[in-house]
């Protein structure tokens, strides 16, 4: 019964595709009789689409729909978060908006047509005009997604390598210009087949719709869409990683130097503190009756004194030994020296430096892991497709199975669904924004509890 149901669904889809194809062909033929020359691409040699096995049809359709849904939801959240959550309204996040827009367009205009082709048994039944639109949009949107990733990498590199100058240069106008350049380059790579740099007539002799296999265009588009951006991303992220490692070593060197200086200065500091206490206690003023406590602490030994007629109004932090002071009416005072433990409120500078060093190292390790994940995911998703894309025109016998080719194509599309997670969810501010968008009641409740817990 289930098999009959799926077969009937597939037959309904095929009939709908046939009607759409007929309308497109009629429209294109009507236009060609008035303005354009007719297309010399025979569509009569189409073979009837093969019937996909039931399990493959169901699992494949569900998988593709899940990928589309993840891409749409994830990238929509990124766009909404940047424009609605105040901490994310930063000019550098416009690169993420451009990336999300291109990935969202891939999910809306490109992926569904692949699903239709899959339901039709791997046959293209939508006509030549739709095929040309489909292949052009595919190249344009996927290239813009990849080039946006490259722009994000360059933005991070400039921000780390030359932070002062780039902070002044990174304005809204500058970022928008870079984004426009990304989309113009994507158009320059995707438009040539439309103006004649193609061999579509050879590819569309049968019921299929594929990218142009013209050798020069394949090399040009593969280099501009993937291999050059990949090279830029690898070089830039490696430089970022090296810069981070150098910063860690520099911080460690400074910490070690400050520890040595701190250790050498301990004895001198204690002597100066005691001497200063004796000097300050001897000072008097004409302002009779003014009492100013003077407490000097060095972390190991505390010297406490009181000058009844002091001209200095300053005091260092009070210590618990102040209650043991004794003073006389003639302006003199007794000084008690008492060994105390290190004040918990004033930790050792060396410990503070070590703590900061650990935090810095942890941040740099997380950044390095993020860089490694970004490069790995990008290469893993797109490298198989572009390797097969480049080899195909130069090796006629190296023909991939249709299912393998389809898997490579969808693996590249998966990158568009993973980008929101890599560039958004790994960021704490984006996680907070997503939580605020998806669970506003939980965020309000958490804020109320936090406010009620405060004294």
Curated annotation (Swiss-Prot):
GO CC terms: membrane; plasma membrane
GO biological processes: G protein-coupled dopamine receptor signaling pathway; octopamine or tyramine signaling pathway
GO MF, any single term: G protein-coupled amine receptor activity
Alphabetized InterPro entries for the sequence: GPCR_Rhodpsn, GPCR_Rhodpsn_7TM, Octopmn_rcpt
Domain of life: Eukaryota
UniProt-annotated location(s): Cell membrane
Sugar-modified residues: 4, 26
PROSITE patterns per record: G_PROTEIN_RECEP_F1_1, G_PROTEIN_RECEP_F1_2
Keyword Disulfide bond found: yes
Annotated tissue distribution: The different isoforms are expressed in specific, but overlapping sets of sensory, inter- and motor neurons, including AIY, AIZ and RIA interneurons. They are also expressed in pharyngeal cells, head muscles and excretory gland cells.
Parts of the chain on the Extracellular side: 1-60, 116-133, 198-221, 393-407
Keyword vocabulary terms for this entry: Cell membrane, Disulfide bond, G-protein coupled receptor, Glycoprotein, Membrane, Receptor, Transducer, Transmembrane, Transmembrane helix
Stretches that traverse the bilayer: 61-83, 94-115, 134-154, 175-197, 222-243, 371-392, 408-428
Residue pairs linked by disulfide bridges in the UniProt entry: 131-209
Similarity comment: Belongs to the G-protein coupled receptor 1 family.
Entry function: G-protein coupled receptor for tyramine, a known neurotransmitter and neuromodulator and direct precursor of octopamine. The rank order of potency is tyramine > octopamine > dopamine > serotonin > epinephrine = norepinephrine.
Protein name: Tyramine receptor Ser-2
Species per Swiss-Prot/TrEMBL record: Caenorhabditis elegans
């Amino acid at each position: 019964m289930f098999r009959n149901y799926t077969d009937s669904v597939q037959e309904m889809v095929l009939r709908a595709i046939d009607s759409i194809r007929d309308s497109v062909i009629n429209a294109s033929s009507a236009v060609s009789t008035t303005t354009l020359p007719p297309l010399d691409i025979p569509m009569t040699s189409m073979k009837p689409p093969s019937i996909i096995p039931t399990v493959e049809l169901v699992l494949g359709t569900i998988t593709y729909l899940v990928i589309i849904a993840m891409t749409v939801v994830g990238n929509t959240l990124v766009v909404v978060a940047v424009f609605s959550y105040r901490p994310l309204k930063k000019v550098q996040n416009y690169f993420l908006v451009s990336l999300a827009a291109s990935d969202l367009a891939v999910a809306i205009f490109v992926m569904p047509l692949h699903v239709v082709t899959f339901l039709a048994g791997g046959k293209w039944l939508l006509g030549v005009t739709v095929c040309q639109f489909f292949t052009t949009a595919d190249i344009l949107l996927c290239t813009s997604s990849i080039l946006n990733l490259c722009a994000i990498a360059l933005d991070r590199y400039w921000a780390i390598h030359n932070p002062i100058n780039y902070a002044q240069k990174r304005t809204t106008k500058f970022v928008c210009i870079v984004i426009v350049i990304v989309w113009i380059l994507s158009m320059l790579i995707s438009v040539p087949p439309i103006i004649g740099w193609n061999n579509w007539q050879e590819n569309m002799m049968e019921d299929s719709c594929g990218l142009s296999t013209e050798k020069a265009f394949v090399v040009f588009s593969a280099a501009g869409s993937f291999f050059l951006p990949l090279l830029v991303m690898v070089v830039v992220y490696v430089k970022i990683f090296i810069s981070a490692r150098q910063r860690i070593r520099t911080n460690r060197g400074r910490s070690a130097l400050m520890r040595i200086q701190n250790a050498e200065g301990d004895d001198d500091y204690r002597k100066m503190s005691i001497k200063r206490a004796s000097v300050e206690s001897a000072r008097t003023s004409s302002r009779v009756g003014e009492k100013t406590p003077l407490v000097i602490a060095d972390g190991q030994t505390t010297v406490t004194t009181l000058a009844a007629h002091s001209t200095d109004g300053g005091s260092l932090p009070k210590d618990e030994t102040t209650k043991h002071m004794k003073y006389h009416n003639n302006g003199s005072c007794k000084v008690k020296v008492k060994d105390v433990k290190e004040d918990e409120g004033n930790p050792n500078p060396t410990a503070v430096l070590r703590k900061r060093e650990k935090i810095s190292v942890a941040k740099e390790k997380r950044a390095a892991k993020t860089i490694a994940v970004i490069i790995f995911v990008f290469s893993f998703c797109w490298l198989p497709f572009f390797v097969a894309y480049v080899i195909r025109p130069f090796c006629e016998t190296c023909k991939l199975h249709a299912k393998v080719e389809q898997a490579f194509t969808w693996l590249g599309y998966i990158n568009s669904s993973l980008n929101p997670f890599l560039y958004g969810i790994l960021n704490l501010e984006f996680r907070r924004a997503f939580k605020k968008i998806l669970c506003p009641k939980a965020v309000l409740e958490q804020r109320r509890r936090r406010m009620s817990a405060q004294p």
